[in-house]
Amino acid sequence: RVAEIARAFGMTVLIAERVGQAPRSADYTAFDEVLANADILTLHCPLSPETTHLINHDTIAKMAKRPLLINVARGGVVDSQAVVDAIHQGKLLGYASDVFEQEPMATDDPLMTLATYPRVLFTPHNAWGSANAQRKLWSILAQQVSSFILNHE
């Protein structure tokens, strides 16, 4: 959905392939190429051994355009200290996240030092908790329970 909204604003969207993998189709771009060309980089991947600290000092060094980095994946996908260093060094335009390596965010998390920066935004990871999202969740649950009961009578 992020790509759809970005395209509506006239943005060119690059979808990254997994690190080290050749693009599987024309819709995918090599990870390093995305890093080199992104003005805005949003993260939407699961946390796994392959994605832990996916964004780190080395990957930030490959970012040629000083992008805005948005992490809505998992906290561990981003190396907090690398982000802090990049903000201080002007390598990132800004940083936004609703996820942290430890939740709630630890008081000694390096990201806490950015809390008052003008281009840094931290929000709680609870978009699922809106009234509409909860109604939809309960509706889906009711449908699944009903289907289970009807199919097992």
Enumerate the predicted regions with their spans.
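A generic structural signal for short
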Residues: 48, 71-72
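Rossmann-like dinucleotide/phosphate-binding beta-alpha-beta segment
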Residues: 1-65
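Rossmann-like dinucleotide-binding domain for NAD(H)/NADP(H)
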Residues: 66, 72-153
